[in-house]
């Protein structure tokens, strides 16, 4: 399948098949101010970095994509599967500084326009949801815990229209070079999707897991047509020139920002 994320300055821009008022993308690590290691475009306030750097990067992205910072919403992610509906009242949450608002949220959706849903990533899977006909957009953060917790199915529980009208984009995340131990593998085998389709055993206590594929399988099992699910080829762990990777860089790294908004 043709790659739909097109590289632009500071971010990957998702190319839709049809004309749309939706903007969907994922930032890269290039050409910023942050020390990860140098001149990196870090988008997270919750790691060791200057607040000025983050605000400057936000301003740059805001100008590039046409969504001012006061229209952004950012939750405090905790690798859980809690979902919240956001409205215009949430605009600006956790953008200038982090607060207790939207704490413990790893999935958001809205039917309001002129809101940019944002979350940070550095190997975990960004899962974008949208329906042009229903004025709906959503964003989920699915690391191994969120995937095991079936956060994508929690997102679907909030969708009150036919899944034929729902499109899913699975964005840049770690490849199956990401390895889990026996205990985590056993957890995934509890799920009703076929673990052999996304887990590759490489020896005792070493198993490669394809989290992008796992989330796609969960969505399909829940009834989303496979034709409505797009999976990017971009891998955070295999493209360190473009992306931060928490696992490869042993936690000493920045974060990318996934975003989706509707005018």
Curated annotation (Swiss-Prot):
Q: Which coenzyme or cofactor does it need? A: Cu(2+); Zn(2+)
**Which molecular function term from Gene Ontology is one that the record holds?**
adenosine deaminase activity
Which residues are Zn(2+)-binding? Answer: 79, 124, 141
Q: Which residues form a coiled coil?
A: none
Listed EC numbers: 2.4.2.1, 3.5.4.4, 2.4.2.28
List the Pfam families: Cu-oxidase_4
Q: Which UniProt keywords apply?
A: Copper, Hydrolase, Metal-binding, Oxidoreductase, Transferase, Zinc
This enzyme catalyses: adenosine + phosphate = alpha-D-ribose 1-phosphate + adenine; S-methyl-5'-thioadenosine + phosphate = 5-(methylsulfanyl)-alpha-D-ribose 1-phosphate + adenine; inosine + phosphate = alpha-D-ribose 1-phosphate + hypoxanthine; adenosine + H2O + H(+) = inosine + NH4(+)
Family membership: Belongs to the purine nucleoside phosphorylase YfiH/LACC1 family.
Subunit-structure text: Homodimer.
Purpose: Purine nucleoside enzyme that catalyzes the phosphorolysis of adenosine and inosine nucleosides, yielding D-ribose 1-phosphate and the respective free bases, adenine and hypoxanthine. Also catalyzes the phosphorolysis of S-methyl-5'-thioadenosine into adenine and S-methyl-5-thio-alpha-D-ribose 1-phosphate. Also has adenosine deaminase activity.
- What's the protein here called? Purine nucleoside phosphorylase SERP0752
Which source organism? Staphylococcus epidermidis (strain ATCC 35984 / DSM 28319 / BCRC 17069 / CCUG 31568 / BM 3577 / RP62A)
């Amino acid at each position: 399948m043709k790659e739909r994320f097109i590289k632009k300055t500071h971010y990957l821009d998702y190319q839709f098949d049809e004309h749309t008022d939706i903007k969907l993308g994922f930032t890269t690590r290039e050409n910023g101010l942050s020390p990860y290691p140098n001149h990196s475009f870090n988008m997270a306030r919750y790691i060791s970095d200057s607040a000025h750097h983050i605000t400057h990067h936000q301003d740059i992205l805001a100008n590039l994509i046409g969504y001012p910072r006061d229209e952004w919403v950012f939750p405090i992610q905790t690798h859980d599967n809690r979902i919240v509906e956001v409205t215009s009242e949430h605009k600006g949450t956790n953008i200038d500084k982090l607060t207790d608002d939207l704490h413990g949220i790893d999935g958001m959706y809205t039917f309001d326009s002129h809101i940019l849903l944002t979350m940070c990533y550095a190997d975990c899977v960004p899962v974008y949801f949208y329906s042009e006909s229903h004025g709906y957009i959503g964003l989920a953060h699915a690391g191994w815990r969120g995937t095991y917790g079936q956060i994508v199915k929690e997102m679907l529980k909030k969708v009150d229209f036919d899944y034929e009208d729902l499109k899913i984009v699975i964005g840049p995340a770690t490849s199956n070079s990401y390895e889990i131990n026996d205990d985590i593998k056993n957890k995934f085998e509890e799920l009703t999707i076929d673990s052999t389709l996304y887990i590759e055993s490489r020896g005792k206590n070493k198993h490669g897991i394809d989290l992008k594929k796992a989330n796609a399988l969960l969505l399909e099992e829940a009834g989303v047509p496979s034709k409505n699910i797009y999976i990017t080829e971009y891998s955070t762990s295999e493209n360190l020139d473009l992306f931060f990777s928490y696992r490869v860089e042993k936690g000493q790294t920045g974060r990318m920002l996934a975003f989706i908004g509707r005018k």
